[in-house]
Amino acid sequence: CRERLKEFDDLARMCITSPPYYGLRNYGDEENQIGIEQTPEDYVWELVKVFREVKNNLTEDGTLWLNIGDSYYNYRPGKGQGLVKQSVSKTNQDLPSKCNRRGNKLQGYKEKDLIGIPWLLAFALRKDGWYLRQDIIWSKPNPMPESVRDRCTKSHEYIFLFSKNQNYYFDVDAIKEPTVDGRGLKRKKSVWSVNTKPYKDAHFAVFPEELIKPCILAGSEEGDLILDPFMGSGTTAVAAKSLNRDYIGCELNHDYGLSLIHISEPTRPTPI
């Protein structure tokens, strides 16, 4: 996606995306895919490089809305059971040898540690020049069940709001919510309750449209261009089109419905 981003000619008003989670699954392209790095730090660094290109493709008042999940360290020497366990989705064991899932012990991590990938990435992006403006909690009323018995079931993920510059576009009125008595509107708070939704061709839940729409409404105006460098099943494109925005993005995985379609015309693309 880094190379593809360099080819884009138009500036997006905002980027909203959910990158491949660390150690989740194999997309079949070991050379280009993200998420199979040997260490969490390597994974974060690859994403930092992607979002450098994203910044170059944003207007000066543009924003980045980033959803990212976490992982647990799972050291099992000699058993080949893997390095991390996802708390947000089912893991796919068919991962290439490039990914450090063979029980190689990493410095600084203890077995059962929550790695803290969302915040590792957030701080790395801030250090790279992004303004870290807010952490939004995606609360999941229907989280994936977990068999673990020594902690609570994980039922949230983060959405981070970054801005390219100190002053940026944010329409607070566009996402106001009804008051309890229904007589007025109030500002949207930072905990969003949205159900997960499965994707028919994947073994895990994907970015829900109801989670994306408030981000688009707050971060752009009608007719603006929305960027997603990890388009996945195309939910960002669907949400953008429904809100009269244009969209552009790319996707490596052939299994998704977009199947390597790169949307490159900022003029009301055909429905997917």
Region spans (language model):
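Single conserved hydrophobic/aromatic residue that forms the stacking wall/gate
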Residues: 261-272
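Core catalytic lobe of class I
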Residues: 1-259
